[in-house]
Regions:
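A structural motif shared across PLP-dependent enzymes of the aminotransferase-like
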Residues: 51-54, 72-84
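Short SAM/SAH-binding signature in class I
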Residues: 187-191
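Residue-level marker of beta-strand positions
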Residues: 39-40, 54, 80, 123
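Short amphipathic alpha-helix with an adjacent loop that forms part of the alpha/beta core around
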Residues: 175-186
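Local cysteine-cluster metal-coordination motifs and their immediate loop/turn environment
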Residues: 1, 47-65
């Protein structure tokens, strides 16, 4: 939404937004080997140069010249998009489009919980209950018992309660810091 409203400092404009994309292959180039017309695919949202040190080490996600579709280059909110075969991942028929677009936020959630070394007795604070925050909540609730979710939308906070948040905070209408301290018995969160 920050890109749409022009408040995302990382974005370049003008810009067609949309970075979590599922599509159907309509046409392929001469060098395409594995994609077929009609394949349903999810698109890697980041592009990398393939030449810099991180790329040469297989870490294109931290490329020195990384560009994100929908942020730095045009994204998926259009009828057609040309994408290199290497950025397309064929989806099984058993996976719905709605579930497929959540693959990227879910992988970030898994990596976040893993890197945080989240433990059962941690007090986790998730700020934001959008796609990424909700994905973190789903993964973290399998590990951690004490999860606080903060957002400014009551409907998202209600969904968070049903998805495993022990506490929720509406950061627009409640004293955020006081609520965190109340829910953590004065300690504050151990992971956020």
């Amino acid at each position: 939404m920050g890109i749409y409203h022009g408040t995302n400092a990382a974005a370049t404009y003008p810009r067609i937004i949309g970075h979590e994309m599922v599509g159907v292959v309509e046409e392929t180039g001469a060098d395409v080997k594995n994609l077929k017309i009609g394949n349903r695919v999810i698109i890697n949202q980041v592009t990398s140069c393939g030449e810099c040190y991180p790329c040469r080490k297989g870490r294109g996600n931290v490329c020195d010249h990384l560009k994100v579709r929908g942020v730095h280059i045009d994204g998926g909110y259009r009828e057609y998009i040309a994408v290199p075969e290497s950025d397309c991942y064929i989806l099984p028929d058993s996976l719905s489009d709605e579930d497929a677009v959540m693959i990227e936020p879910t992988t970030i959630a898994i990596q976040s919980c893993t890197r945080a070394e989240l433990e059962k007795d941690d007090m986790l604070l998730i700020y934001g209950a959008g796609a990424l925050g909700s994905s973190i909540l789903k993964i973290a609730s399998k590990i951690c018992d004490h999860i606080i979710v903060a957002d400014i939308m009551d409907d998202k906070l209600e969904e968070a309660k049903h998805a495993g948040a022990k506490y929720t905070i509406n950061a627009m209408t409640e004293d955020f810091q006081a609520k965190v301290l109340e829910y953590t018995h004065g300690r504050g969160s151990t992971v956020s």
